[in-house]
């Protein structure tokens, strides 16, 4: 790789930063962002979206890998062949927000619920998929999407869904999932 970036997050970050529903930021939020970088562009994914493929293919031309060195404090190292003459632009943070999520910051629990709705064929992350499948585009602010998301939130609560369990199960227990989904439900109500 032509560039390596190591990001050291502050000790105590998980206690100091909370989501809108009071849930604490966790390493799982970062890992979910890593997963989502890849999953929507994979043809065998339940949330595959061909609109995600071009950006993903471009990303793969320079991406070489990443490694979580530590979860507390969080330290993430990334290798890439893409680099800029201004070093501060070479940092890969995996902060759970744009560009991975095209609508701002989001915790793993919110993305999990939206993924369930997308896998269920009721919502789509992109306008392209929404149009081609004749379904609503995911909207976390208003519209019919909220009713669909509420339904899948109830499902996630009932199932204590740990999304991408083989990977995120290393960072989330069923009890963690129940707490996060419960906080989201209370905030939404």
Predicted segments, located by residue:
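Aromatic- and charge-enriched surface segment that lines or borders ligand/interaction sites
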Residues: 1-46, 78
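Surface-exposed binding/hinge segments that line
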Residues: 8, 47-188
